[in-house]
Amino acid sequence: MWWGALSLLFWVPVQAAFLKMETVTVEEGQTLTLTCVTSQTKNVSLQWLAPSGFTIFLNQHPALKSSKYQLLHHSATQLSISVSNVTLREEGVYTCLHYGSSVKTKQVRVTVLVTPFQPTVEALVLRRQNGEKSVVLKCSTERSKPPPQITWLLGEGLEIYGELNHEFEADGKICNTSSMLIARAYGKNSTVHCIIQHEGLHGRKLVAPFQFEDLVADQETSDQETSDAPEQSSLSSQALQQPTSTVSMMENSSIPETDKEEKEHATQDPGLSTEASAQHTGLARRKSGILLLTLVSFLIFILFIIVQLFIMKLRKAHVVWKKESEISEQALESYRSRSNNEETSSQENSSQAPQSKRCMNYITRLYSGAKTKKSAQHWKLGGKHSRVPESIV
């Protein structure tokens, strides 16, 4: 916690008595030494911060558990540390803080140099239909920071520049550099040197010689086999499309030329099979890429139409199903209401049937009783009438 609190002091505005910015340049793989000195001797604490803002050392106490950071010297007035095997990750601004009656700040900007590799020279012989020949030279070096300077040293000490090409890697810091030169005339014993100059070399130069003697010998051998095929050591056909410098070289002299028309003619001559092949390959790739893109677009369009038709069919089926479900629900409700009505009427009929039957029985009994009574009365009256005449007589 207290390491973090002390690290945050770097980002908070402080009352700095002085602010110094030093610049230190170190080569990749070497050891970086950082020294912080103060004139105060009492109640002083010294702290080194990494470019990321984290504490490296507070007095003699290490804060980062890394073997790259070592304590060289600590006293009341000095704190010296070292960073071993420096890489591009260690590049940036390091800060020293003096904690006393006031906070003093010292900053050191560290720049890491990456020295280039030993250069290599490649050659390509171009032969045109009219019999003229020229040699394309390419000098390449890899992995440097900053980009190096490449020159060509001709036979009698004449140093010229070629056409530079820088290609940076993904980090945007490391650079791969090449230089191209066209030799339109040269002798069998001529020699050309590719020279690399860089800050990390401290005045030294990286030199790669190229002798035309070997090229002429190979050329004579190839002339016996075929007179029209171009000879290539290890240079790709794409390199021919880049603009290059043109020179003429003889055995004991070197004269620079700047004939743009001949250079363009040598580069764009349709008789060169390598260039024609490269153009044909590029055109074929472009056509195949366009055809593939068109086919993919057409397939995506067809798939989109199929999906839309499927969605429309699904919606139509859903509407039909919804209507059918509504009709079935209405029929079910009607059937249920009809069943309820029939049950109610049947229950009413069943409840009225016993009552009517009892009424009929009651009426039948009354009728039979009344009939019996009437017949009895009639019989009595009949008996009386029969006896009256006899008494009268």
Swiss-Prot record:
Its main location: membrane. Residues 17-111 form the Ig-like V-type domain. GO terms for cellular component: immunological synapse; plasma membrane. Residues 119-208 form the Ig-like C2-type domain. A motif (PDZ-binding) lies at residues 390-393. Keywords: Adaptive immunity, Cell adhesion, Cell membrane, Disulfide bond, Glycoprotein, Immunity, Immunoglobulin domain, Membrane, Repeat, Signal, Transmembrane, Transmembrane helix. In the immune system, expression is restricted to activated class-I MHC-restricted cells, including NKT, NK and CD8+ T-cells (at protein level). Transiently expressed in activated CD8+ T-cells and a subset of activated CD4+ T-cells (at protein level). Expressed in activated intestinal T-cells, specifically intraepithelial CD4+ CD8+ T-cells, intraepithelial CD4+ T-cells and, CD8+ T-cells in the intestine epithelium, lamina propria, Peyer's Patches and mesenteric lymph nodes. Also expressed in spleen, brain and testis. Residues 218-228 have a biased composition (Acidic residues). SUPFAM superfamilies: Immunoglobulin. SMART domains: IG (SM00409). Residues 1-16 form the signal peptide. Residues 218-280, 333-356 are annotated as: Disordered. Residues 257-267 have a biased composition (Basic and acidic residues). It is a single-pass type I membrane protein. GO terms for biological process: adaptive immune response; cell recognition; detection of stimulus; detection of tumor cell; establishment of T cell polarity; heterophilic cell-cell adhesion via plasma membrane cell adhesion molecules; lymphocyte migration into lymphoid organs; negative regulation of activated T cell proliferation. The chain crosses the membrane at residues 290-310. The keyword Heme does not apply. Residues 311-393 are cytoplasmic. It is found in: Cell membrane. Monomer. May form homodimer (via Ig-like V-type domain). Interacts (via Ig-like V-type domain) with CADM1 (via Ig-like V-type domain); the interaction competes with CRTAM homodimerization and CADM1 homodimerization. Interacts (via PDZ-binding motif) with SCRIB (via PDZ domain 3); the interaction promotes CRTAM and SCRIB polarization in a subset of CD4+ T-cells. Belongs to the nectin family. This is Cytotoxic and regulatory T-cell molecule.
